[in-house]
Amino acid sequence: MLKIQDFEFVKVVGVGAFGKVHLVRLKSSPTSVFAMKMLDFGEILRQRLADQLENEISILKRIYGCPFVAKLYSTDFHGGKVGLIMEYVGGGELFYWLKKCGRFDEQMARFYAAEIISALRFIHGRGILYRDLKPENILITSTGHIKLIDFGFSVYESENIYMISGTPEYMSPEKLRSEDDGRASDYWGLGVMIYEMLCGDPPFYDSSADAIYHKILESNVVFPHYVSPVARCLITGLLDKNRATRLGTKGICEIMGHPFFKGIDWHEVESRRIEPPFIPNPNTVLSSLASSGELKGTDDAETVVLKPYKHIKHLYKVSKGL
């Protein structure tokens, strides 16, 4: 089992509410790099979020092997911090590339939407609701495909959820009404994502969370003139405020069969054999080190064979000694 001490810390690549995400290098195999999320477990306990962390780790184990989800390889506890050792995905956030481009054309948006749908199909097939679909939670691999990250708000489908959680712009009407949100809420998030990819901003954007919530519950989607009729039809179906009639109610295949995806070979999508619209430039660290043959990422590369850690209950046992 991998330990935190088995890694050399290279640089910080992200900062969150409870810790940092580091780019790390395996000491025994210096050409292999990973992402390590280091969380302050004491703060997690104070915020009463230990159950949420335990749940996230459990879910990442359940969906291990999904080609569109960043893998969790191992967990460790050291010095009052929990380390989640994960697949490093070096192409940056979809959010970054979207803001850099302003908006995507339909071909580009269709590619990413198809891979997101394939990810949701896998996740839902394992009885899990993602519940936080947004461009910041989608990373691009070195070969141009997507990887979903951050399953902190995800839940098992069998659980009853009556709480508001997530990012305001992407919340579904039923979630705002504190109703039990199921797969339909993920399909709502997909609709928001597709709109944002095509238009540059979410459909219900405003300066305050309350104003956003009001628009989600009361306003209709307004499309720029350049959005095609078939794209409007797809987005309108996904952003149906009535989840009982929302596109996808009859199953995710209803979305996959929409004319917007005409010509898409879903088997090719799921096997990642469709050519991505672009290949991202590696970040500065990977670029400088990889050019000398010193470093390569774990995304899309069989560098080290690891198994996900199976005994996550140790977090609770260790916490008693804090």
Swiss-Prot record:
InterPro entries on file: AGC-kinase_C, Kinase-like_dom_sf, Prot_kinase_dom, Protein_kinase_ATP_BS, Ser/Thr_kinase_AS, STKc_AGC
Pfam families from the UniProt entry: Pkinase
Domain AGC-kinase C-terminal: from-to ranges: 262-322
Molecular function per GO: ATP binding; cAMP-dependent protein kinase activity; protein serine kinase activity
Enzyme class: transferase
Entry EC no(s): 2.7.11.11
Keywords: ATP-binding, Kinase, Nucleotide-binding, Serine/threonine-protein kinase, Transferase
SMART domains noted in UniProt: S_TKc
Binding site for ATP: V13, G14, V15, G16, A17, F18, G19, K20, V21, K37
CC terms in the record's Gene Ontology section: cAMP-dependent protein kinase complex
Transmembrane segments: none
Catalyses which reaction(s): L-seryl-[protein] + ATP = O-phospho-L-seryl-[protein] + ADP + H(+); L-threonyl-[protein] + ATP = O-phospho-L-threonyl-[protein] + ADP + H(+)
SUPFAM superfamilies with a match to the protein in the record: Protein kinase-like (PK-like)
Stretch forming the signal peptide: none
Residues forming the catalytic site: D132
Family: Belongs to the protein kinase superfamily. AGC Ser/Thr protein kinase family. cAMP subfamily.
Name of the featured protein: Probable cAMP-dependent protein kinase catalytic subunit
